[in-house]
Amino acid sequence: MTSGVRMHAMPEDGTCAIAEVNRPAISVVVIGRNEGTRLVRCIESVRQAHGITIREIIYVDSASTDGSPEFASHLGATVIVVRPERPTAAIGRNVGWRHAASDLILFLDGDTILDPDFAFSAYEVLSQDVSLAAVWGHRREIHPETSLYNRVLDLDWMYRAGLSEFCGGDVLMRRDALVKTRGFDETLIAGEEPELCRRIRNLGYGILHIDCPMTGHDLEILRWSQYWKRATRAGYAYASVSEKFRMSADPFWTADRRRNMMRGSFWGVSFIVSVVASLWAGVLPFVLWLSILLLASIRSAWKARWKGASPGVLLLYGLHSHLQQLPILFGQLQFQLGKRRKKAQRLIEYKGRPVA
């Protein structure tokens, strides 16, 4: 699976040198493919972490063609290039943590920027509570002003602090929990973090979301097609993860998957019916459908008001929470079709060209 491991010395400034006395040390695993300058920005942010020693930065690259491995190597990271037939984020993360030397592993996506205080804050929490296996914080969009998609989807990253069922791709984890669970499921093209968290929780560990900044993220969604693909991938994740635990004593995401099917079907079928009816009875049926969608969006916006966005953005977020059910439904149906045909789904990518 790996096409070679290249080891590189850490910078002479000591940012990523051997752990200093009395300072906690962690390993950082960054994964990416064709992230370009986003990757450079990510690694540089790791080197600026406060209060903690970065023992090593391990960058696992999925056969980039934009020079990402060379960028990471120049910044002092250990670079591992993987070339699987079916690349997944899970493969990269597993390769990374298995090469790491520390008991605590900070996972990052290559398109993120680490908040300088998060690693130490998360370390403090884990060191004080042995029942926790993972700690994560707030991920927010770096450029919400770039598009309405970015501005609205920025709110999707916001979760209330406290114990949670799962985390995302940016998280500080105990190596012990990864060893006991054997890490991420490499067959999943999406949803690998919640799936792992489900198995971690079954071991008796907790997953904690703390109320502090963790990472900045760059969705870079500028077109409807990108939005559709991202939501389709989410639907595929719901279906594939819930299918894995469907017959277990502790099913996971089964209710979510069923609810997604119902909501997506409702909006899709009702839209078609309203359009067809409008051909015979004028615009009234379609206006009625729009009114129902608007009322549902207002209700969702009101429920999300704790996220602190402006009324206009909240209304768009409410609209998003319903319209995304269509591509989510499509993703779930895509999983079912692939399962019936016994055909593995390749990675669903929504980003455009890499940033050079």
Mark where each language-model region is.
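A conserved acidic beta->alpha catalytic loop
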Residues: 45, 61-69, 112-113
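Conserved donor NDP-sugar-binding/catalytic core segment of glycosyltransferases
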Residues: 113-148, 218
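Short, acidic, metal-binding catalytic loop of nucleotide-sugar glycosyltransferases
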Residues: 44-54
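Membrane-embedded multi-pass helical conduit in multi-pass membrane proteins
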Residues: 264-340
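Short aromatic/hydrophobic "clamp" motif used to bind/position activated sugar donors
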Residues: 105
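Catalytic donor/gating beta->alpha subdomain of glycosyltransferases that bind UDP-sugars
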Residues: 187, 194-252
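A recurrent flexible, glycine/aromatic-enriched loop bordering the glycosyltransferase active site
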Residues: 140-142, 156-179, 189, 195, ...
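Glycine-rich, basic loop-to-helix element that forms the pyrophosphate-binding segment
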Residues: 83-100, 165, 169
